[in-house]
Amino acid sequence: MSIHIRKMRYLPLVAALALAGCGGDDGGAGSASALSSAGAPHTSSSPAVTAPPSASNVDKSVSPVELPDTVVPVNYRLWFRPNDALNAFDGRADVEIKVLKPVNNIVIAGHRIKFTNGRITLQPGNIQLIATPQDKGDFYQLRPVAGTIAPGNYSLHMEWSGIINFKSYDDPATQTGGSCGDDPYPGCSAAEGVFRVDLKGTDGKTSGAILTQGETNLSRQWFPGWDEPAFRPTYEVTAEVPQSWRVVSNAAEKPSTNVGGGYKLVQFEKTPPMPSYLLFFGGGLFDTYEDDFTSPLPGGKGGLHLRVFTPPGMSEWAKPAMDRTKQALDYYYRYTGIPLPLTKFDTVAANDAFKEQKDLNFGGMENWGSILEFADDILPQPGQPMSHYGNEVLTHEVAHQWFGDLVTTDWWDNVWLNESFATFFETKTTIQFFPNEFSWLDQVKNKYRVINRDIGPNAFPVAPNFNDWASNDFVLSASAFTYDKGGHVLKTLENYLGEQTLRKGLQQYLVDYSFGNGTPKRLWDALSKESGQAVGPIGDSYVRQTGVPLISLDTQCDLTKNQTVVTLKQQPFPNKNAYPGLQWTVPITLAYGQGLAKRTTLALKDTQAQTRIEGCTGVIADPSGLDYYVVNYSDTAWSGLLTQVNSSTDPVLLANLKSEAALLVANNLAPASRSTSIGSVASPAAMKLRQTPTFDGIEAVTKERPARQYQGLFKPRKVVTQ
């Protein structure tokens, strides 16, 4: 899910995990520059198509966290109808379920909905169920009047009414009234469950429309059910809407039927198995721009019909978004070798009454087959290019179709498995398709922004593993780590393992856990199998604790063997963390030799290690400038490094050294001469860097991503998921 880059007030967890959704890197938008292709290597062509590996015989399921595992939903037949005022709706569902063992009740999630008395039944047997609210209305027990429910296959019928959200509050100052005024939880937003937007056409006229937002646990405001990632039923959506509306959902639309009164019945094909938060519906006076995507895979497997839904009169504005969508799909098809299990792919671009107030709190959502964006981000006026942010947010949401939708995180403390990957891939696609908008220097700047946050008092692990402290304190700032730090960790792993090794490992991960759930261990195991390296200790040490490792590097020349002895030590970088990291397994790349052209890698798992390299030479750690650790060189090592850097043509390497030195000096870990010496380098790289006024080293962080909104406190995990 994509989010707006703006300062927000801190909210307890909950605020942290629902409306952050996906999307765009908040570290300096890449500037068009001659340095766009400098630094870390990348290819200029799309990835070559490779066949994905065969699936392994693995368990792709996980245990639910909040709901019992005794009842499993198989398929939803969902119907709903908004009222004329677009402030409420009626809903009903027939859900095929499997009861796995005798139960006294069926527990489902539901929030701000009202069940219709006498309209909850179980078939066969015509068993009447009574809905009893639990946990402030977030869950219900559906109890039979007498007896228990035996194991077997059933059809659960439910009817209810719900609210269509439109305003956050009637009085924002006092947070009273309006659609959220009766909600006791913090961070209530208009974009929850079913919500209304005002489409504004090119003629200036506005019209009401409805959209849905399910992440993280907001779909329970639309329909009651099994609202967590462990459950993946299929869905068949039906709705009664005004005759003039165009509608969109995850699956392809069937022919509609006139039901009178100015309304029509619209129906959609069955979706792939997916978690409830990805289910989507949109309806209103949309225009559409259409095209087709031709799959690059053998036999054209996985071709898609594409549409962009726009406000009235803006269909021609959607051409750039259509082009970007086709580019992104082509890239991800090639990279993964896996086609989407869909027949169509839609992008819904809605402008709305909330954009000026920024109450929606996000920039996009990865609903499977129907991503949600906003018009001012991805619909430039005819003849104008799409904004950098629009490109990022669109490619971010498309990446989620694989990382998040095809394979879904097991629970929200591992949402980085969705978001870090989408952030990582939005960078890759920007390099591929928009090189004039990309600069590796901005990636260096972003890394140090994140490091500054990571050593501060409000740092959180990328994967916090919710417990008592996290449930209460996982605030908005956590999203800087869920998205950005996680993306930098993935880049560090790519630098260490190699681009193609990482790619093949990710292909195995996606194939093995398609239509299932990913976990960190499942990811690490796939990468370890492909690389032959123990990736788990590296990955867990980075995502499960805060802070950044400080690497001390010393060199000594062994003249008798013509070798350089490199001594490496690690400790936590000085920080203000409440729960600081202590030790990492750090994947280190060393560059050495003439022009720093030679490479060697090692994983520093102990507090100290030594390695030898051929020749008496200057050595630099992290030659890409993008690895997630800070290096403090001894005087001897620094002197040898400067000798090599003085002839360097890589401004990214120099930019990293400059930022690194500034950080060390600011924390009294290195003398001031460290900064002045790197600042006086007169290499070709330095000349390029000085011609880039946008690069000025470390910047204070003034912007935060709003994070996901959650209704209440997440249930703590008792054990770390494997």
Predicted regions mapped to residue ranges:
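Gram-negative bacterial Sec-dependent N-terminal signal peptides
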Residues: 2-26
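Bacterial Sec-dependent N-terminal signal peptides
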Residues: 17-50
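Acidic/His-enriched low-complexity segments
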Residues: 22, 42, 47-343, 347, ...
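Hydrophobic alpha-helical and helix-loop surface patches within well-folded domains
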Residues: 29-34, 115, 268, 300-301, ...
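A ubiquitous short alpha-helical element
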Residues: 59-61, 79, 313-316, 410, ...
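Non-catalytic, well-ordered alpha-helical scaffold segments
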Residues: 73, 235, 419, 487, ...
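Structural motif
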Residues: 84-86, 228, 468, 479-483, ...
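Long, ordered, helix-rich scaffold segments
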Residues: 448, 561, 565-567, 578-580, ...
